[in-house]
Structure formats: structure tokens, C-alpha cells
Amino acid sequence: DQNNWAGKYPNDWNNYTKLMKDAAAAYQLALRWKLSETDGAQYADAAVAILNDWAKTCTGFIVNDKGEFIDPNEFLIFIQVHQIANAAEIMRSYPGWQEADFVKFKAWIADVFYPHITKFLSTHNGNECALHYWLNWDLSAMTALLSIGILADDNFKINEAIQYFKFGIGSGNIGNGVP
């Protein structure tokens, strides 16, 4: 969030670029560990360090007094949410990731991202035409929602993503996305 990062990264106060790079790194490191023919603990430890750092440092988004993103392009951060959630899902079986840290990460990803994801899918940023946003906007939100649900073992969130795919109001609905 801006309070944590504005001084350190004045040109990236919303952390989008940091999350993009860190999510990709955590995912690649997790894969490298999981597919390693040797121990690969150095890859696992590096992935876990990235995941733990985000859960400890990032406290949320900068929003206006209505709880809305200042820049609507911040909805695109959902593209990285599924990637970092999938990295955590791979790492959940790593014995070196402390259970308390894993629990904290699950709570963090759900608390920080889920409210914005579900709000976007239900309101499309207040746009009168739910189809205003192209398919990729809904798909990134749906995959983020599904990934959070799977990571958190939360059937409500998993079903919310599936139900949106089947019956949602926007382009992510299969009937709207593939006419």
C-alpha cells in the first residue's frame, strides 16, 4: 500500500509492478522446487520468503472514500493474484513453510484481494453496462477468485467463481464470452 511503499518506490506506489515480478518469481521458484530432481530447498525457501514478505508487508489497496480504486486499472492486479495464489498452493506441501506463515498468507490473500474481486464481478466498477469490460477483466477476477478459494479450501469462493462463469452478468459468463 502507499504508506508502506511510496517513499521507497515513488513511481510505483500501488505496487502493481512489484507484485507482478514477485508473483512470477514465486511461481517459477515453486515450480523449480516441485520439479527438482534434487532437494531444491533453496528454490523453496526463496519462494516462501516472497510469499511471507507480501503477507507481512502489504496491508491493502489505496482507495477513495467510497472504498473504490483510485485508478481503475488496478483491477488488472487480479492477473497476478492467481499466480501468487498458485505459488502458495504448490508450496503448501513444503515442510520448510511454517504452518503459521501459511495460515497468515491465506488470510492475507483473502482479506486483501477477495473483497475487490467479488465487488468488481458484481458491479463492474459501477458501469451500467456489465459487458463494458472485455473478457480478460472478468477472467482475471474469476481465476483470482477460484485460486484464492482453492488455496483457502473455501468452497464458497470456489462456487462463487464457478457460478459467475455460468450465470454472471459480464463477459466472463460463458454465454457472453463465447456467444
Each predicted region: which residue ranges?
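Aromatic-lined, polymer-binding surfaces characteristic
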Residues: 12-179
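Low-complexity, Ser/Thr/Pro/Gly-enriched N-terminal "stalk/linker" regions
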Residues: 1-12
